[in-house]
UniProtKB/Swiss-Prot annotation:
PROSITE patterns (UniProt xref): EF_HAND_2, TPR, TPR_REGION
Top-level taxonomy: Eukaryota, Viridiplantae, Streptophyta, Embryophyta, Tracheophyta
UniProt keywords, alphabetically: Coiled coil, Metal-binding, Repeat, TPR repeat
Species for this entry: Arabidopsis thaliana (Mouse-ear cress)
Coiled-coil residues: 773-794
SUPFAM superfamilies tied to this protein: EF-hand (SSF47473), TPR-like (SSF48452)
GO CC term, one of those recorded: Golgi apparatus
Placement of TPR repeats on the sequence: 234-267, 269-301, 310-343, 344-377, 378-411, 412-445, 447-479
GO MF assignments: calcium ion binding
InterPro entries per record: EF-hand-dom_pair, EF_hand_dom, TPR-like_helical_dom_sf, TPR_rpt
Protein name: Uncharacterized TPR repeat-containing protein At1g05150
Domain EF-hand: 6-41, 600-635
Pfam (any one): TPR_16
């Protein structure tokens, strides 16, 4: 990392390169030439250039000379604010920094003893603490503050020495290469954004030495409070906080920044720094609140804090992502990129967040822009490759993943995701190589160990797969690992049996057409119904909507009304923007962890919001949304249907009535089918528009709505099968395994009454049967539990014994 001195010299060389008339300022033409020259890969239009220049000259108005343009100090400020990468621009322009230039000022100073003494003191100040302290924008203002900083540095050094001696100071050793992960683009300082490449340090806070340190730190804080003015006290607490932050004493730094907030509530800097501390401490909600206060202060402070807005937006977005609020984070990343078009981290974060909510095309566009601005950005390459893979552009994705790995050979995310891509393509040997490289960087990555086992199994290396599974079991005791080991044992037994007679070269299963699957008994689910219900149940489990009581949806409608707006068609609706909808979902799914909630939002955005926002306006009809999610929420089925009906009543067109229009009812049912049964529903959606006019005056009662809803052919009759899955899909059937996939049967067991083999839910729904049981048709009986199967067996034995008695 460049020192402050070399950094400023580089900026000066760049400034001189484009100050063509040597008047000490960069006019619009000179600035335009600079922007184009440092972005050789970007083809700017005249409109884009003018927009960038307008933004620069407006944001940095205090550094604009009316007759000359942007001054050197102004250009330095733009780089300090993260608007560009000094090192990258310097290299792109082919400039060189002479070593002698940094020492000229020192030699000139020797001509005057008094000046020499003064400059020597300043130089010592610069050397004894971090570069931020001497920054003209955010540095130390009062001389007394320097004394506090000096004393604090001594205290920290003493604490570090004692804890290192006692072996109490711990670095984060969970992995061997922290820098191998995709960075968050975290703007740590009120200056240039920088990646956190050093390891996290954990201080032993319960030790006696730490207690003494905190006590002595309290004395320094008291000195800061006893300053001659409020401004000097603020300066002292900010400096103390920043020194503590640099040494990763985040809890203590937070105390200082909070005190600085009390002294100057309208200053952006302490709120920003407090937000950073809270985020590092894992308190994302409190971090978000501090950044919102910083944003409020910056927006009300006029141009004084305008240059900080992009970084506040970026860190606010990161804090929101920490809560799982990815749609909201996208909004702030987008704002940062608009304010600062060369902010490559904002563009990368925007692309990554868009990928996280399933908007892959938009993600690719943002990530490609980030890479144009920073071609060696490994993390952007990694997420771009993941987006391309999600769009089906696998060969290009492999190339981009490889580029990310070339840029950063130990990049865990790129290696792991490339392994997953190779698995999807059936290239198991290459996949196992990628997972092996992940484990080289991060030895206790249990998912990589498990996936390595699966890829080795796919490559036919059963013994190696078994060893890899055992290694994974040492790292975690998750139940799926036990199932996988059991699965391997069954495969080995089957392989041993087949060595004698074989299957005639056939695969592990054959797929039978649906008409050949017959059911025995009224309770046995039809194969097509189960296949559809399994897909809906999978969506329900990913979104965790089953954890949301449907009464909470009713309460949300009652307590938080949505203002009426008018859509493009002119009809009144209660619609809100997607980020606001995300806030409502966060309340409904408040028990979810952030990463789980993020997965839920992605699934809902892809499956539901994409259809509800078919115009691409970014707004969603909330009445229709509540009605669509109600059938999958928790609670009795009758309550779910009632809430769905009430949600349609809540829409402006039906409000105040006890009945809904038939248009709404038909549209809802067809939308429900289009979302959850897409193979049937999409064509039906096209018919709705032609029916609206004729049915707009016809109303539907709740009982009529129920009849429409429960219709097995034209309604959502599949819900009865979904309810059965909800009740039984965690049931285990003892030692019973599926005859096709060889995994333990979980959920219902489907037993073929003639051949007597058993299938799990998934294989039955997909129509898979063992190749050794070829029949003209298959008759299945469904058992929801093993107790039910035993009961049926006892009844069968009883009937047989009666028959024998009669025969004799």
């Amino acid at each position: 990392m460049a020192t402050r001195g070399s950094r400023s010299e580089k900026v000066k060389r760049i400034f001189q390169q484009f100050d063509g008339n040597h008047d000490g300022g960069l006019n619009r033409e000179e600035m335009a030439a600079l922007v184009v020259a440092v972005n050789p890969r970007v083809k700017f239009s005249d409109e884009q250039i003018n927009a960038i220049l307008d933004e620069v000259f407006r944001t940095y108005a205090e550094f604009i000379d009316p007759n000359k343009g942007l001054t050197y100090d102004g250009l330095l400020r733009t780089y300090d604010d993260g608007a560009g990468d000094v090192d990258r621009d310097f290299d792109a322009l082919g400039l060189e920094l002479n070593a002698d230039e940094t020492t000229i000022k020192g030699s000139e100073a020797a001509s005057s003893s008094s000046i020499t003494d003064e400059r020597a003191v300043e130089a010592q100040k610069k050397q004894r603490t971090a570069a931020w302290a001497v920054s003209p924008n955010h540095g130390i203002v009062f001389d007394e503050t320097w004394k506090l900083v000096d004393d604090l540095e001594i205290l920290v050094k003493r604490l570090k020495s004692k804890q290192e001696k006692d072996g109490k100071l711990k670095a984060d050793n969970n992995n061997n290469n922290v820098d191998a992960f995709s960075d968050a683009g975290w703007s740590r300082e009120l200056g240039p954004s920088s990646e956190i490449s050093e390891k996290r340090i954990y201080w032993e806070e319960s030790s006696h030495d730490y207690g003494v340190f905190v006590k002595e730190l309290g004395v320094l804080r008291s000195k800061a409070d006893g300053a001659r003015s409020r401004e000097e006290a603020f300066d002292g607490h900010m400096a103390i906080g920043r020194v503590l932050y640099e040494h990763q004493l985040f809890k203590e730094a937070l105390v200082s920044f909070k005190r600085a907030c009390e002294l100057q509530p309208t200053d952006v800097r302490p709120h920003f720094k407090a937000g950073n501390c809270l985020y590092v401490l894992g308190k994302c909600k409190e971090s978000k609140d501090e950044f919102l206060l910083a944003l409020e202060a910056a927006e009300s402070g006029g141009n004084q804090w305008a240059y900080l807005l992009p970084q506040i937006y970026v860190n606010l977005g990161i804090a929101l992502e920490g809560e799982g609020m990815v749609l909201s984070a996208c909004e702030y990343y987008r704002e940062a990129a608009i304010l600062c078009p060369t902010h490559f981290r904002a563009l990368k974060l925007l692309g990554s967040a868009l990928f996280g909510v399933g908007e892959y095309r938009a993600a690719v566009k943002a990530l490609e822009e980030a890479i144009y601005l920073k071609p060696d950005y490994a993390d952007a390459h990694c997420d771009l490759a993941s987006s391309l893979h999600s769009m089906g552009e696998d060969e290009r994705a492999i190339e981009v993943f490889q580029r990310a790995i070339d840029l950063k050979p130990g990049h865990v995310d790129a290696l792991y995701n490339l392994g997953g891509l190779y698995m999807d393509l059936g290239r198991f040997q290459r996949a196992s190589e990628m997972y092996t490289r992940v484990l080289t960087v991060w030895p206790n990555h249990w998912r990589a160990q498990l996936n390595k086992a699966v890829s080795l199994l796919g490559a036919g290396e059963t013994e190696e797969a078994k060893r890899a599974l055992k290694e994974a079991l040492k790292l975690t005791n998750r139940v799926e690992l036990h199932d996988a080991i059991s699965h391997l044992k069954h495969l080995q037994k089957k392989k041993g049996k087949n060595n004698g007679n074989g299957n005639g070269g056939e695969g592990p299963f054959i797929v039978v057409e649906p008409s050949k699957f017959k059911t025995v008994g009224e309770k046995t689910t039809l194969r097509p119904d189960l296949a559809t219900a399994l897909q809906i149940r999978a969506f329900q489990r990913v979104t965790r909507l089953g954890k949301c009581d449907v009464e909470a949806v009713r309460k949300e409608m009652r307590d938080n009304d949505v203002p009426v707006s008018y859509s493009g068609s002119g009809g009144p609706t209660k619609s809100i923007r997607k980020p606001n909808l995300e806030e409502i979902l966060r309340r409904l799914l408040s028990s979810l962890k952030p990463d789980t909630f993020q997965g839920a939002i992605k699934a809902i955005n892809e499956k539901i919001l994409a259809l509800l926002d078919d115009s691409g306006s970014g707004r969603v009809d909330m009445g229709m949304f509540y009605a669509v999610i109600a059938p999958l929420c928790g609670g009795h089925s009758d309550k779910r249907k009632r809430v769905a009906f009430d949600a349609l009543l809540w829409r402006p067109v039906n409000e105040g009535s006890s009945q809904i229009t038939k248009t709404d009812a038909v549209k809802y049912i067809k939308l429900l089918r289009a979302i959850y049964i897409p193979s049937h529903g999409m064509s039906e959606m096209l018919e709705v528009h032609g029916e609206e006019e004729a049915e707009s005056s016809v109303t539907v009662t709740f009982n009529q709505f129920l009849a429409m809803f429960d219709d097995p052919d034209w309604g959502f009759g599949i819900m009865s099968t979904i309810l059965k899955l909800e009740a039984n899909d965690r049931n285990r059937h003892g030692n019973q395994v599926c005859s096709v996939c060889r995994y333990p049967v979980i959920g219902s067991r489907f037993k073929e009454v003639k051949a007597r083999f058993s299938l799990c839910n998934q294989c039955y729904g997909e129509g898979k049967v063992p190749p050794s049981f070829k029949q003209e048709e298959y008759k299945f009986r469904e058992y929801e539990s093993e107790a039910e199967a035993m009961k049926a067996k006892c009844v069968c034995f009883s009937m047989q014994s009666h028959k024998k008695a009669i025969a004799t």
